[in-house]
């Protein structure tokens, strides 16, 4: 427990913060790495560490450093790589973005409005550094397009976007960053641009697909509400390292089971239910306790075979097909840092 920024509250508070790596697509998401962040006040306090049973090998690391380690571990475990999505608290960190590039991955990283970039010029002259907010305000009207990226619960989701090729301005001592895309959102009913992303994805990616990727974080935010409130991920009140991760592991396992069941068991309704063939009783079925005209001797008394124990004709839910690439769109689940 430490007084620090709490994303759920949007302000400073006494709380515990975890760095999470999830895999996600439009249908579901699932955390695959979950680690408690320990600030300096904890890592440098030996009595406090001992009381909370913090392993001696744990040293202070920033949240971006923990996130990068989680991505490396996922790749080492042969998790299918996808585009890395980050909110602004991670995406603004140039070291994390560069580390992702060195791993051979692409990212779509939300950034804050004060991040400096150099717009790419056709004459190859080196432009001055400018904040992404100032760059957005200076774009001509024809640079903006209204993009619809998906169907919402009540209406199509759309907003106004622009994209510009830029170089992220390096900090002192950093090498020049490669050319990438700055994506900007400026809803028509807002006085100024509201959101910014840096993306090193293929320049040939369609405008809509780029917006769709940037907006995929809604899946994580939506699922985290269920994880924290319905499953109880946010209910832990203990003070030990092991207890925190034990509670998180069980909560995530329970959530993984639930999203598997949602795929296996369709919602109630005549349209979906009619598609499910009801299992038929096997030939020769006899209710338990009914007289058997051909009673068996004691060694063969129980004639029920294990194959009759379950008559469900469903796929094994352990493979979680909702997180595999669909046939309609062969796209891997993306990495999302939370």
Question: Predicted segments — roles?
Answer:
Residues 1-21, 49, 115:
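Extended, low-complexity cationic-aromatic segments
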Residues 10, 24-60, 108-219, 314, ...:
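An anionic, glycine-rich sequence signature occurring as long contiguous blocks
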Residues 20, 248-261:
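Short, hydrophobic/amphipathic alpha-helical patches that form generic packing surfaces
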Residues 95, 199, 207-214, 229-246:
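Short, solvent-exposed helix-loop connector elements
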Residues 258-294:
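Conserved nucleotidyltransferase catalytic core and NTase-mimicking acidic/glycine-rich helix/loop elements
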């Amino acid at each position: 427990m430490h007084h620090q920024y709490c994303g759920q509250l949007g302000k400073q508070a006494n709380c515990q913060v975890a760095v999470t790596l999830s895999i996600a697509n439009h249908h579901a998401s699932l955390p695959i790495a979950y680690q408690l962040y320990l600030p300096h006040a904890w890592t440098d306090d030996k009595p406090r560490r001992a009381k909370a049973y913090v392993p001696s090998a744990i040293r202070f690391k920033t949240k971006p450093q923990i996130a990068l380690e989680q991505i490396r571990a996922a790749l080492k475990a042969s998790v299918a790589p996808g585009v890395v999505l980050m909110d602004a608290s991670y995406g603004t960190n140039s070291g994390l973005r560069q580390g992702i590039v060195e791993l051979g991955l692409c990212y779509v990283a939300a950034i804050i409005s004060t991040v400096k970039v150099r717009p790419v010029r056709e004459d190859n002259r080196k432009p001055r550094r400018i904040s992404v907010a100032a760059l957005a305000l200076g774009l001509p009207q024809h640079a903006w397009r209204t993009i619809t990226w998906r169907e919402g619960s009540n209406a199509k989701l759309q907003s106004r976007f622009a994209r510009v090729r830029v170089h992220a301005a390096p900090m002192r001592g950093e090498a020049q960053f490669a050319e990438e895309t700055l994506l900007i959102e400026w809803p028509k009913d807002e006085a100024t641009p509201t959101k910014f992303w840096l993306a090193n994805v293929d320049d040939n990616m369609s405008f809509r697909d780029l917006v769709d990727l940037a907006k995929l974080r809604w899946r994580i935010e939506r699922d985290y509400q269920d994880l924290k409130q319905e499953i109880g991920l946010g209910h832990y009140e203990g003070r030990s390292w092991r207890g925190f991760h034990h509670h998180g592991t069980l909560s995530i396992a329970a959530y993984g089971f639930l999203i598997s069941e949602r795929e296996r068991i369709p919602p109630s309704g005549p349209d979906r239910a009619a598609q499910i063939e009801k299992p038929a009783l096997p030939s020769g079925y006899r209710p338990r306790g009914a007289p058997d005209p051909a009673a068996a001797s004691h060694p063969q008394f129980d004639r029920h075979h294990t194959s009759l124990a379950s008559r469900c004709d469903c796929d094994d839910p352990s493979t979680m097909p909702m997180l595999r690439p669909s046939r309609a769109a062969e796209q891997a689940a993306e990495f999302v840092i939370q």
